[in-house]
Amino acid sequence: MPVNPKDRYDAMTDYLGRVGQFGPCMMRCSASTQVSIDYVDERDSIEKLRLGTVIGPILAYFFRNTPYFEGEKNPWPLLRQRMWDYLDFQRTNVLPGLFDPRYGWEDYAIDVLSTPLMFADLTHTPEAVASGATPKELHRPAFRENAGEVYPDRELNPYEINHIISTHFNDVRLKNFIELRHWDSLPIERAERLTEIVSSLFYVPEHRDRLESYFEGISEEEVFEAKANIQAHGREATPYGQPLHFWKEFLGLEGLLSDIPGDPKHPDVFQE
C-alpha cells in the first residue's frame, strides 16, 4: 500500500520500518479518530494530559473498530494501541514522567527536543534557507540527530516547534491544544458521539472534578498496567482494578451507537 509521496513519509517509512513490530503497518492501517481539547494555562494542560492518558484506553475499548487485521480476525482488543505502543518507545505511548507531581512544560520540551527527529524540516529556518541549501537538504532524514543538533541555537519559530512536536506520537500530545489520539477510525456518527463524551468529561466541571479526585495520585506504572490488562483480558479486563461495566457507568458511556457498521462497505461486519 503506497503512502503520500512526501519526503517526510519516505523518511518515516525507512525509519519506522526498521523498528518495532508494526512500523510499516502504522502508516498504512492505523487510521484514527482524534479529539482535540483546549487548555487555559500550564497547570490545566498537565491535568488534562494526565486525565486523557488515564481514561483513553478505556474509551478506546468501548469505541474499538478493528474486527479484522490483514485478512484475519484481529487478536488484540486494542490493535491501534498495540501497533503504536511497540513502535518506537521514545516517541510513542505514555509521556515519560507525566505523572510525576513536578512535571511541567519544560519536561515536555526536553523530551521532544532530545529525541532523534527522524525527519528534519528546515524549509522555514531562515539560516538554512539563506545558506543556499537544496530542497532535499531542507527536507531530509534525521535518524540520529535531535532538534538541538539540527536547528540553530536560538528561540525556535512556530513552524519549527510544530514540526518537532509532530515527530512524537504519544497517546496524548501537547500543542497549542491537547490532542487525544487513542481511538480507531470511526463512522462519523460514532466519532461525534465520542467527541460529545470527551467534551462532557473535560468541560463539565463536576465530571472533571470527579475523575481527577478518583485518579488522584495515580502512577505511570498503573497506566501501563491498565493498558496491558485490557489487551490481555478484553471484555473481562479490570483496568485500575474495576470491571468494564463499572467504567461504562462511571464515564457515562451511554448511547455508544455500536449498532452502526464500522465500514459502510461492509454493513454486516461489526466489532465483537
Give, region by region, the residue ranges found by the protein language model.
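Loop-rich catalytic cores of soluble enzymes, especially ATP-dependent carboxylate-amine ligases
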Residues: 1-173
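Low-complexity, intrinsically disordered regions enriched in charged/polar residues
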Residues: 6, 155, 159, 163, ...
